[in-house]
């Protein structure tokens, strides 16, 4: 482990960032033609332009992140569990990306719920129920905090997933969001801050191929994993309410997107056709 080779956390962070960037860039190049291809989104902004592009790069950069963090983050049971859940959230999106018929929202929502419950129980088992809000610190009843954690993780996965759809948008906002946590809570995050640096390195490598005009898309495999990771940063920094500010772009854009699609599908009402904010469909309609 690189932690054993250097006592300087900044050196470890730098090495982790460079490894994640280089490995992701290399794997994107090697496996680009082996990924499933996008068929466009029914209600996404310029969704037809995505047709034919390689989709599911999230599979590549999430696995690269997992491998690099094994080298730079101390081996602890809690982090290993979160890494398994990160991969699970990625796989749920990747299998949907690769499916001939898109998974319905209820199926993916149930998978997200299971992941959120396991992550919530794990977090409370290792960290307790203390919460920080501004300058105050207090404890919540176990059941109450567990419910709030489940809501946070489930919502984060879905609003981030909904924001994906425009070249470079979702990954760029994720880099800014993760960077915000690192600037504000690097000490509190400890090794999770290092994981955040690794995540940013992988995303920046992905953006090399995703910046407009893109040739590669992360798909649900990437966006769902990003949502899970951002939620875990919110919890591990000890300030879960910081999510409301750090992820404000995801919250606004994703929530409006979910509202738009819900009204379109269930009430046949079309709104927000033109907006200064990107509003995308959270899932594919049909292939």
Model-predicted regions and their roles:
Residues 2-252:
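"…together with the soluble PPM/PP2C metallo-phosphatase catalytic core" -> "…together
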Residues 33, 202, 257, 277-278:
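Active-site-proximal helix/loop capping residues that flank conserved catalytic or ligand/cofactor
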Residues 33, 37, 261, 281:
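Charged/polar, solvent-exposed surface patches and flexible loops
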Residues 52, 105, 257, 281-282:
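Short alpha-helical segments used as structural interaction elements across diverse proteins
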Residues 250, 254-277:
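Membrane-proximal soluble regions of multi-pass membrane proteins
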Residues 277-278, 282-287:
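Single conserved hydrophobic/aromatic residue that forms the stacking wall/gate
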């Amino acid at each position: 482990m690189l932690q054993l080779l250097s006592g300087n956390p900044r050196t470890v962070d730098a090495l982790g960032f460079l490894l994640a960037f280089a490995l992701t860039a290399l794997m994107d190049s090697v496996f680009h033609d082996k990924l499933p291809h996008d068929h466009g989104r029914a209600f996404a902004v310029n969704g037809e332009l995505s047709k034919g592009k390689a989709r599911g790069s999230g599979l590549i950069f999430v696995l690269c992140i997992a491998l690099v963090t094994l080298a730079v983050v101390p081996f602890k049971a809690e982090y290993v569990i979160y890494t398994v859940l990160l991969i699970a959230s990625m796989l749920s999106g990747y299998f949907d990306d690769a499916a001939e018929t898109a998974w319905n929202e209820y199926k993916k929502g149930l998978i997200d719920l299971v992941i959120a419950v396991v992550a919530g129980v794990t977090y409370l088992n290792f960290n307790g129920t203390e919460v920080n809000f501004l300058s105050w610190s207090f404890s919540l009843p176990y059941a109450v905090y567990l419910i709030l954690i489940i809501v946070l993780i489930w919502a984060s996965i879905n609003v981030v997933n909904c924001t994906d759809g425009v070249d470079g948008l979702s990954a760029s906002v994720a880099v800014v969001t993760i960077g915000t946590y690192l600037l504000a809570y690097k000490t509190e995050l400890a090794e999770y801050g290092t994981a955040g640096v690794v995540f940013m390195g992988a995303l920046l490598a992905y953006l090399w191929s995703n910046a407009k005009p893109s040739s590669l898309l992360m798909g649900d495999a990437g966006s769902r994993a990003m949502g899970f990771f951002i939620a875990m940063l919110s919890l591990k920094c000890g300030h879960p309410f910081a999510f409301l500010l750090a992820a404000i772009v995801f919250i606004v854009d994703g929530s409006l997107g979910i509202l738009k699609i819900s009204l379109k599908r269930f009430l046949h009402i079309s709104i927000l056709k033109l907006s200064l904010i990107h509003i995308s469909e959270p899932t594919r309609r049909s292939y």
